[in-house]
A protein has these predicted regions:
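DNA polymerase processivity clamps
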Residues: 1-28, 32-84, 99-180
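Bateman (tandem CBS) regulatory domains
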Residues: 94-98
Length: 180
């Protein structure tokens, strides 16, 4: 199922997994009380409505899943939805089993750096943002027919050095999450 998001409760943590065919987003957060382990798939349209309510909310959302439905309580609003039936895609098979490199960097710093090197990218001049991961820095660069942009940021790095390219729009999508 790709029309919904996986909510997985395991070891007193809630993991939410979303896929769009190009990217995987995973968010894991501890739960305040004990729950039995389970997996449910919540429709994407329901979560879009819940997100609208959360943007205007100061408080916490309460999530109450049942066997076939889920209830979200946000401030004075209640959203009830049927759950999707079927198995969520096996996203774990797309994740590397052994990590050879781990990079820890400030989300804001990374986004600002990607924005700077993306100035040369247009709809006509698409080019990946290349990241060269060294000992304690990440060098970002982009080359188009208009020129070359480079930037460098500090990072905590363990493992092998690496060079990898990304679509800048996918990296910049983290902006909305970083602002929360």
């Amino acid at each position: 199922l790709m029309t919904g998001e996986l909510f997985e409760i395991k070891d007193n943590c809630l993991k939410v997994v979303s896929l769009d065919g190009h990217r995987i987003a995973i968010r894991k957060m501890p739960l305040k009380r004990e729950y039995s382990d389970r997996k449910i798939v919540v429709p994407g349209k329901t979560l879009s409505e819940v997100l609208k309510l959360l943007k205007d909310s100061e408080g916490e959302a309460k999530i109450c899943p049942s066997r076939r439905h889920i209830l979200f309580r946000i401030d004075n609003y209640t959203v009830i939805s049927a759950l999707l039936e079927g198995e969520f895609l096996d996203y774990k098979s797309a994740l590397p089993k052994d990590k050879k490199t781990e990079v820890t960097v400030s989300t804001r710093t990374m986004i600002e750096s990607v924005e700077r090197v993306s100035l040369l990218i247009t709809d006509r001049l698409k080019s990946p943002v290349r990241c060269v991961i060294g000992e304690d820095t990440v060098k970002l660069f982009c080359t188009t027919t208009m020129g070359r942009a480079t930037d460098q940021i500090s990072a905590e790095i363990s493992g092998d050095q690496l060079e990898i390219g990304f679509n800048n729009k996918y990296l910049l999508d983290a902006r909305s999450e970083e602002r929360r």
